[in-house]
C-alpha cells in the first residue's frame, strides 16, 4: 500500500488482497476439514473399503497422514488416483527394500491396490459433511464451480511454480480476460542461453 500511495498523485482506494488459498475457499461450498478429523474420516473409509478392523486408529494415523498428503497432491495436480503410472512407481520404490518382519511392504501394496476405492469413499464421506481437504476443494472449484467474480479484474502476483489446479484456474481467468499476471522469476534464467542451477 505504501508503494501504491507513493505512485499516486492523490488519494486512492487500496486494492483488496487475498491469498490463492483464500480465493479457492471463497468459491467453494465446501469447508476445509480439521486435519485430525480428516484422518479419522479417512480411517473410516479405509476400514469400509478394506474390511480391516484389526488396524487401530492409532496405528493407522501415521499411514493416514501420508495417504491424506498423497490425495492432496493427486487433486492439486488433477491426477487420477488409479493411475497405472503411480502403481509402477510404487513397485520400483519397494523393489529396493527387503521385506521387514511386520510385512510393511505387503501391507502397503495391499493398501495401494485399494487406493482408488479409498480415495473415492473418503471424498464422498467428506462431501456428505460439506468438508474437504485443500486439494479436494481446489479441484472442486476448477472442475465444477462457476466462479462468480467479485471484481471486474484480478491481478495475480508473485507466482513462479504452479500446480495443475492453479494453472487451470489462471487459464480460465485469462480466457475470460479477467486477470493480469505478474510472475516471480529471475529474468536471467528465463533467457534460453542461460541454465538454471
Language model features with spans:
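Basic/charged alpha-beta structural segments of nucleotide/phosphate-handling enzymes
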Residues: 3-149, 164, 186
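Hydrophobic/aromatic beta-strand patches that form the interior of the parallel beta-sheet core
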Residues: 16-18, 155, 180-182
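Generic detector of short, well-ordered, non-transmembrane alpha-helical segments enriched
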Residues: 38, 158, 196-197
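Generic detector of intrinsically disordered, low-complexity, polar/charged segments
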Residues: 59-61, 155, 194
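Conserved P-loop NTPase "ATPase switch" module shared by AAA+ and STAND
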Residues: 150-162
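Conserved RecA-like helicase ATPase core segment
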Residues: 152, 166-197
